[in-house]
C-alpha cells in the first residue's frame, strides 16, 4: 500500500529540486507567476506633461481614462518613467509602493494625492530574470513617481491593479534601451500593460509660459519634430528614432536631454510586426512640449 502522504511529499520535493526552489514560500511565489493569456496586451507611450494632469479633469486625463476602457483589464502595469533615471537598471519589488511627489511649486492638493496600488514582488523577480542584457536590481526604496501615478490614477482609479516601475539607466545608449524592451515581450502575453511615460518633445527651458492656455501653440521646430516623430513611428523606422541625434537642429531642440524621450524607445521596442499604431493627445503645450501619445497593438 502506497502512503499517499509520503508520495506527495516526494513529488513536492522533486518539484523543488527541479526548479531550484528552496522552500514552500518560494514555491508559492513561483507558482503565482502570471500565466500566458489568450490575447496580447497593447503597449502605450504616454506623454504625461505637467503633474497637475494627475488631478485635473482635462482633455489629456479624459483620454487616459477612455483608453483604459478600450483595452483588456491588465494583470499588472509596468511603467518606464522619465523620472526614475538611475545608474544601472532597477525594478520596484516591494509589496506596497509609496506615492512619490517628485516636484515642487504646485498647489497643496497635488501633494496630498495618494495612489495605493499594490506592488507585485514575484512579477518583479520574474521580469528581472527575463532581462539578460544587464543585471537588474530589485528595488525596495523607490515607489510610484509622478510619471506613473498621474496617468494611472485616471486609468485605474480604484488602485486595485499591481503597478511596477522599471528604471532608465542613464549610462546606456538609446539602442540599449530599445533592445532591453524586446526582452520584455513575454509580459505582453501575460496580460501586463507596459507604459513608456515621458514626452517626445520636451524642452522645459523654452516653454512659453504665457501661452500655456493657448491650444496647440507650438514653436515651428516643435511642430516639425512632432510630425517627424509620428511619421517615423508609422513607417516603423525605428533606427532613425533610436539615432535621434541625426535629426538635425530641430531634433536637438526637441530632445535637449534624453530622459523624457527614452521611454518612447521602450514602447517601440515592444512593437510586434503586426501591431497597428494609433496616436492620441496629439498636441503641443506651451510651445515646446508635446503630449502626443501612442497606442501599439
Which positions does each model-derived feature cover?
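A short aromatic-anchored loop/beta-hairpin motif
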Residues: 33-135
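Internal, conserved structured core segments that host functional sites
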Residues: 123-178, 183
